[in-house]
Amino acid sequence: MTRTEAFEMAWKLAAKEKIFSLVDEIYHPDYKAVGSITGIEVNLAADKEVYLALIEHLILTPAKTVDEGKDFLRIERYTKYRETDIFMSGTTTITYKDGKIITQESVGEELDYDPSEGQDWNW
């Protein structure tokens, strides 16, 4: 299983079943990230809370690997808000320590078009 697949599977289980065992397996105990909106440093527990609050409003496409090295991974995905036609493109850059995620940074950009048009997937 690739690191992108492991990341995807872990967070998908968390979204569907609210089970974080796979998330806990792939994250380093010293994990820290800076919230992209608040600029505040957060730990994994805070990331889990935010994820659960947001995911019920979003439809996510599968993550696609953009770039990968020994200690980093960059993935891209599209999101759509369930309640309205707001589309986003997001990139997450992940760094690893001892084979586990130690930091991640996500950057999103609102799109003025539906990225599913002309693709082999839809919402």
Task: Annotate each PLM feature.
Residues 1-123:
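C-terminal and inter-domain tail/linker signature
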